[in-house]
Design a protein with these regions (language model features):
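Conserved phosphate- and dinucleotide-binding cores of soluble alpha/beta proteins
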Residues: 3-7, 58-221
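N-terminal active-site beta-alpha-beta segment that forms phosphate/nucleotide-binding
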Residues: 1-77
Length: 221
């Protein structure tokens, strides 16, 4: 079956490395903060001006003045820094973020990403995504494999206005973990209980399927 939002966050958290500075985008990416491997030193950055963001707060820990870029209440780790958004974006544009995790509407086989606008619908604005895709070389996109209408979000070419071009190399969906190389998606892992055939059927862009595609593993709850 398809991964839950929490399982997607758990899988992305496995891509963290000790000493990383990581920016988490709005939506599913924010959940990753709850699944950083124990004992690993990772500094989470929020573009509204927080370095050292912690997990989501318990009810007793909620501080309405401590929020992330998505206006969600968060915690701050010991040693965290709070600063202006100008300084925050200087970190991003200067290439000081080791890993960025973003949501998206579409990704294509050339590594293009569309994440900010659907024509005819309310547009909130670009946010920090354009700076992040330009300033970070290591980006993971997390999104559902298909839209609510069943249309694939993994395309030969993005149909929506782009956020960035040729910048995405890894995608985690609720069905699969894929890499992008040489104009194709490469299937690396599949969600537990999801068949390769289902992933093929729901991927519009060119898809390379190895002889063996392992299932993702999750600890029993």
């Amino acid at each position: 079956m398809a991964l839950s939002r929490e399982q997607m966050a758990q899988r992305v958290a496995r891509e963290m490395q000790d000493g990383y500075y990581v920016n988490l985008g709005i939506g599913i990416p924010t959940l990753v903060a709850n699944y950083i491997p124990e004992g690993m030193e990772v500094m989470l950055q929020s573009e509204n001006g927080l370095l050292g963001m912690g997990a989501f707060p318990t009810e007793a820990e909620v501080d309405a003045d401590m929020i992330n870029a998505g206006k969600q209440t968060v915690t701050a780790r010991i040693g965290a820094s709070i600063f202006s958004s100008a300084e925050s974006f200087a970190m991003i544009r200067g290439g000081h973020i080791d890993l960025t995790v973003l949501g998206a509407f579409e990704v294509d086989v050339e590594g293009n990403i569309a994440s900010w606008m659907i024509p005819g619908k309310l547009v909130k604005g670009m946010g920090g995504a354009m700076d992040l895709v330009a300033g970070a070389e290591n980006i993971i996109v997390t999104m559902t494999h298909a839209s609510k209408d069943g249309e694939s979000k993994l395309l030969p070419r993005c149909s929506l206005p782009l956020t960035g071009a040729g910048c995405i190399k890894r995608v985690l969906t609720d069905l699969a973990y894929l890499e992008i190389q040489d104009g194709a998606f490469i299937l690396k892992e599949r969600a537990p209980g999801v068949s390769v055939e289902e992933i093929i059927a729901k991927t519009a862009g060119k898809l390379i399927v190895p002889d063996h595609v392992p299932e993702m593993q999750f600890a029993a709850q």
